[in-house]
Swiss-Prot record:
The gene is rpsQ. It comes from Citrifermentans bemidjiense (strain ATCC BAA-1014 / DSM 16622 / JCM 12645 / Bem). This is Small ribosomal subunit protein uS17. Belongs to the universal ribosomal protein uS17 family. GO terms for cellular component: cytosolic small ribosomal subunit. One of its GO terms (molecular function) is structural constituent of ribosome.
Amino acid sequence: MSERGNRKTQVGVVVSDKMDKTAVVKVDRLVKHPVYNKYIKRSAKYKAHDMDNAAKIGDRVLIVETRPLSKDKRWKIRQIIESKG
């Protein structure tokens, strides 16, 4: 058996937990402007699989890339880094 390749991981904040077994995670990143050389904050929202419905709004979580689980879900919550509540 061969090992799986390196999977992408990202750290973000849960912005919605209303769906069953799914959380929406907002991931921020800094991008350097090509002309002004100033860093701009860009964000992306990912739907992540949350098997136990453990993540709550405001929690800081680590998400890892996985196989497609539905039309929009390609990430899983690996761990809750910091709990808001």
